Amino acid sequence: MCHTTFFHGQGFLGISGAILIQMYDTLCKGEPSTYLLMLALLPTLVSLVLMFLVRIYKATTADEKKHLNGFSAVALSIAGYLMIIIILENIFTLPLWARISTFILLLILVVSPLGIAIKALREDSNRSLQKFSIETNLLTDSAEQITSPKFSTAEDPVEYHQLPSGDSKVKGTSDDKMLVNEEQLNLLQAMRTVNFWMLFIAMICGMGSGLATINNMSQIGESLNYTTTEINSLVSLWSIWNFLGRFGAGYVSDYFLHSRGCARPLFMVITLAIMSIGNLVIASGLPGALYAGSVLVGVCYGSQWSLMPTITSEIFGVVHMGTIFNTITIASPVGSYIFSVRVVGYIYDKEASAAGKTCTGTQCFMLSFLIMASATLLGSLAALGLYFRTKSFYNQVILRRLNL
């Protein structure tokens, strides 16, 4: 739906985790059961209420980019606001009135995109009225010319135009069909391609190592003697880095695809390589390394969730995107199991059993993050292979679609 409506610029998400944390701190502090009940009911209720508004709209208006930039500015403002609030809450103990005030301001920011939508609707209405007024004036002028006695009945050769031949019409139709039907694969057809498995392997390495990092953030912080406040800040800020990765990767890849013709898998190569560096930074165990490493890993992890769905729709088509996309997302739990359980959990338990119940020091997670750094580098190489395999496809098909 998003790909069809916003064909020239894909959407983003990922900031909801930080918003829900603020909702818990304000409304359900110390009541986890109430919070879990809200999480169970609220998404379903919102979907039922708003599902009638979900449909395919033609968003190719003259002001589309301006309105999308407005949404982006609001989203970045929310991310910056949440980052400041999370840091303040983990440094100071905010009173109830302050938490309520910050949450109300957050709600105002969340609903502010409605203002952009209403403004866009008014602009479209005014544009339609102006167009109708111009057409009415033209019809009036034409009627006056017809009823006027001073008109010429001489044949004007300029009025005769040659109609396009049947061959040219057929040719244009066949070109359009080629662009529409190109690479519209179903799940079984996609799974028979090398591109599918390259993308799947890259996602196992990228998403799996990212989930392993956030799932073990508390234990990593404890082993490196970080305070509880610092650990809470790291966990809370993960949603911010996740969102910035999703937003940034989508925006940057869209920009370079439209302006430079760069195939989108190239940015998957870059982000997975940076994620490998982030894992090496965490493995070093240097003072402050967990802060820097978590930022790199969090941003690059979020990037995969922005790049993968878009690449899937572009390479395999949108007709069966739902099944293909959800099949590729299996890479996330598979990678999480491999890295969280079989790598990080196994090595930590082994080190903890030798030292007692808990493990302290860089040796607890150094080997695990070295392994994950190697895995993300492997994922980057898989994405590099996908880039070279699809480079000509992007130049010949995707860019032609965007220019239609």
Language-model features: locations:
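Extracytoplasmic gate region of multi-pass secondary transporters
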Residues: 5, 82-98, 177-251, 305, ...
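Glycine-rich segments within core transmembrane alpha-helices of 12-TM secondary carriers
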Residues: 2-52, 62-86, 241-245, 322-344, ...
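Structural signature of the two symmetry-related core transmembrane helices
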Residues: 263-280
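Symmetry-related core transmembrane helices of the 12-TM Major Facilitator Superfamily/SLC fold
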Residues: 35-52, 69-81, 98-115, 361-386
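Interfacial helix-cap and linker-helix signal at transmembrane-aqueous boundaries
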Residues: 23-29, 86-92, 221-222, 252-257, ...
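Intracellular juxtamembrane helix-capping segments at the cytosolic ends
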Residues: 1-8, 17-21, 50, 213-217, ...
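Helix-loop junctions at membrane interfaces in 12-TM secondary transporters
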Residues: 282-293
